[in-house]
C-alpha cells in the first residue's frame, strides 16, 4: 500500500478534509494539495503524450527518405524533447510542492476518536480502583465520573490530603526545587535519599515487567539529529519544546520514542520479524515552553525525568490490537502501584500530529481532586514510517509496505512519584511504598522497604 495520506488524497480526499476538521484544524492545506496533485497528474499525462509523440517521430526519422522531410521531423523531435524536458522539470516541482504540503499534514484520525477541540471532550472508557475523595471535591469527582455514565466506588475523606509538592518539600523534605531553580531554572529539582531509591525502583519495576512481556530493553542515544526529529514529530509546532545543542545538528531527546523509531530508519524489515517490541530506558528533556505557570510547584511537570517507554514496529493489520496491548500493559503497571485511574479516548483536537488515535491513562490525585495524565499510548500508523522510510517485505513476494509505529509510556518516574505521594500518604507524614516495588528495594540495606520516611534535610 502507498502512504495512507497520499492514498486518501487520490481516492478519498473528503477523508482528509474531515480528519482535519475533527482535529479542529483548517482544511485549507488539503484543498491546496488536491489542486497541486490534479495539476501534477495533468502534467504527467502531457509528459506521457509528448514522450509517445517524440518516440513516434523518432521512428519516422529513421524511415524518412527525403532529406527535407527528415530535417523537418528532426526539428519537430527536438521541439517535443525540449517541451517534454520543460514539463518534466515542472512535474518535479509540483511533486515536491505536493510532498511539502502532505508532510505538513497531521495523521488521518481513526473513526473511533471522539469529536472535540479540548481535553473536556476526552471520553473515559474505563475506571479502576477506589479513589480517596475529599468531601470538598465530591462535586468535581462526580463531574469526572457520573457525567460520563460511570459509578465509581470511592472513599470520602474528611481531611484534605496534602498536595504532592508540599509532601515533597515540607513534609518529607526529600526534594528541593528552590535550590534547583537557583542552580538551573524552574522545573528542575533535587531528590534525596528514599525518593532516589524510589525513582530507580520504578524504572526497575517497569523494565522487569516489559522484559517478561517480550520487549527488548534498549538504552538509546540521548540526542538525535534534526532529520530524525522531522521524521517523528511536527517540528514546527514543537521546536520551542526541544533543547538544541548549540552549534551542532543534535537535539536532546524528549522521549526515547524518537531514537527508537529511528533505529530502523531507511531499512526494509522482513515480515517474519514483526512485531518488534522495544522498551526504551532513558532520561527525557523537555523545555515545557507551552506550560506557562501550570504545575510550577513540585515535580509533576519538569525539564528532566527518567522514563521507560514502550515502542512497537507492527504490521498495519495488527496495529490497532497492539495499541490495546500497550495501554493494557500500562494499566497493569499502575494497578501494581495501587493508584486509582481512568483511561480516556483522547478527542481529535487534543491529538498530536503523528497520532491517529491516543489513549491517556489518568491517575486520581486526591489533593487536587482530579484525574491527571500519567501515561499516553498512541498509534502513529505510517505517519513516522513514511518520513523515516521504514518498510517491511511482505512474505512470498517483492512487495514492500510501510510499517506502523506505536508508542506508550510505561512509567515516567517523577510524575509517578507525585501520584504515590498523594495516594499513599499516611497521617504521620510517612508514605507507604507499593508492595510491587519492594522487591526492587529489598536487596539494598540502606534502601527503604515499607515506607518513605520524613527527613531532617541538609
From Swiss-Prot:
SUPFAM superfamilies: Class II aaRS and biotin synthetases (SSF55681), tRNA-binding arm (SSF46589). It is found in: Cytoplasm. ATP binds at residues 286-288, 302, 373-376. It comes from the Archaea. Keywords: Aminoacyl-tRNA synthetase, ATP-binding, Cytoplasm, Ligase, Nucleotide-binding, Protein biosynthesis. It catalyses: tRNA(Ser) + L-serine + ATP = L-seryl-tRNA(Ser) + AMP + diphosphate + H(+); tRNA(Sec) + L-serine + ATP = L-seryl-tRNA(Sec) + AMP + diphosphate + H(+). L-serine binds at residues 255-257, 309, 409. GO terms for cellular component: cytoplasm. PROSITE patterns: AA_TRNA_LIGASE_II. InterPro entries: aa-tRNA-synt_IIb (IPR002314), aa-tRNA-synth_II (IPR006195), aa-tRNA-synth_II/BPL/LPL (IPR045864), Ser-tRNA-ligase_type_1 (IPR002317), Ser-tRNA-synth_1_N (IPR015866), SerRS_1_N_sf (IPR042103), SerRS_core (IPR033729), tRNA-bd_arm (IPR010978). Pathway: Aminoacyl-tRNA biosynthesis; selenocysteinyl-tRNA(Sec) biosynthesis; L-seryl-tRNA(Sec) from L-serine and tRNA(Sec): step 1/1. One of its GO terms (molecular function) is serine-tRNA ligase activity. Its main location: cytoplasm. The keyword ATP-binding applies. It is an enzyme of class 6 (ligase). Its EC number is 6.1.1.11. GO terms for biological process: selenocysteine biosynthetic process; seryl-tRNA aminoacylation. The keyword Cell membrane does not apply. Belongs to the class-II aminoacyl-tRNA synthetase family. Type-1 seryl-tRNA synthetase subfamily. Homodimer. The tRNA molecule binds across the dimer. Consists of two distinct domains, a catalytic core and a N-terminal extension that is involved in tRNA binding. Catalyzes the attachment of serine to tRNA(Ser). Is also able to aminoacylate tRNA(Sec) with serine, to form the misacylated tRNA L-seryl-tRNA(Sec), which will be further converted into selenocysteinyl-tRNA(Sec). This is Serine--tRNA ligase. The lineage of its organism: Archaea, Thermoproteota, Thermoprotei, Desulfurococcales, Desulfurococcaceae.
